[in-house]
Amino acid sequence: MNLIFLGPPGAGKGTQAKRVSEKYGIPQISTGDMLREAVAKGTELGKKAKEYMDKGELVPDEVVIGIVKERLQQPDCEKGFILDGFPRTLAQAEALDEMLKELNKKIDAVINVVVPEEEVVKRITYRRTCRNCGAVYHLIYAPPKEDNKCDKCGGELYQRDDDKEETVRERYRVYKQNTEPLIDYYRKKGILYDVDGTKDIEGVWKEIEAILEKIKS
């Protein structure tokens, strides 16, 4: 079973992809991890990627696709894989299809975790992180016992720049702009499944599980 997970920042797609990975025994592959691994191993493509990353630039699609291809040829991907955070653009989706064709594979389902902008803003802007130990809290869903104080180490809690409202709205806008064409692309192929990401973790999982069981049978 070869899957792609789409969803805006804060949609909880990483959490769900991890559960799918555990239940079905297929690896969850995040582009970030893959790039870091290739750089650490010093592969040809890893060296190329490092040049761009060191300059703070985006790694070009052909390098990313090459790294994805190397990863998908590893033995743990034989039964399937979950791509998390890739593809991000239509060009990447088309390049991915071409590359999968060469490997005699195809995508079976694209799970699109749908969460409206205001919900994303609420989820992310209420996050607080401990300056000392890095523990993460949520002022609504998982608040600290004492205001502004970490339960674990007593450190001060703060809001990361990434979690500030204008940053979150900008990330959401960029996500929508890049992903809308992707969603159309996979919908036309008949493999896109929308999941209501506003439900609790268990509710979202039940929806995803039902889709995957249907695909498997």
Curated annotation (Swiss-Prot):
Source taxon at top rank: Archaea
Compartment annotation: Cytoplasm
E.C. no: 2.7.4.3
Keywords: ATP-binding, Cytoplasm, Kinase, Metal-binding, Nucleotide biosynthesis, Nucleotide-binding, Transferase, Zinc
Catalytic activity: AMP + ATP = 2 ADP
Region of interest (LID), residue spans: 126-163
Region NMP, annotated ranges: 30-59
GO BP term, pick one: AMP salvage
Binding positions (AMP): 31, 36, 57-59, 85-88, 92, 160, 171
GO molecular function (one): adenylate kinase activity
Record text about domains: Consists of three domains, a large central CORE domain and two small peripheral domains, NMPbind and LID, which undergo movements during catalysis. The LID domain closes over the site of phosphoryl transfer upon ATP binding. Assembling and dissambling the active center during each catalytic cycle provides an effective means to prevent ATP hydrolysis. Some bacteria have evolved a zinc-coordinating structure that stabilizes the LID domain.
Subunit architecture: Monomer.
Family according to the record: Belongs to the adenylate kinase family.
Name of the protein in its database record: Adenylate kinase
Organism (species): Archaeoglobus fulgidus (strain ATCC 49558 / DSM 4304 / JCM 9628 / NBRC 100126 / VC-16)
